[in-house]
Amino acid sequence: ELPFIAEVIQVVPDENKWTGPIERLMRSISLTIIVPSKLSDKAEAYLEDNHLGEKISIVCPQSVSKEIKFDEDSVVAKLAFRTELEKSRLKWLRAFLYEKFPHLCFEQRGKKYDSIANALTLEGLVKTEGMIIEKDDTFFLEDASNWVTGWDVSPKQKTLDDSLTKWREEVDR
């Protein structure tokens, strides 16, 4: 009943080249817990009354009156959502993510990229509000061990297994 946003979204398989850039863009919000409104007061009081030693973010879904149309190149259009989500929660989450990340995806910078206020490139360059340019290279785009979104953990598991095998081989030398 209290999923992290990361647990209910993942990049659609046909768009998997965008997984790394989208992971970087959405990482902070992906680690946010979705709390139903009936539990929001208790959750907020618990956060206020307890020192948890970690950063915790919660969000309480609001009602959304209309369905939002997404550009096919938008970040949100490249996401799949868990089918177990109730329709109202799904509608809210799509709108919430689009509001936070209205970015369009571009293979590389160019004229159209320059004319768009919110953009994301395959190399992980993020342009927000036409003036904030960011690139977080704290981990490689292809490094699935740092990915948090998705219910299919096989890419992350494979990366971790490969790393473990490599480390064991180095130790055995």
Predicted regions mapped to residue ranges:
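Extended alpha-helical coiled-coil "stalk/arm" regions
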Residues: 166-173
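Hinge-like oligomerization/junction regions that interrupt long coiled-coil arms in large cytoskeletal
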Residues: 2-166
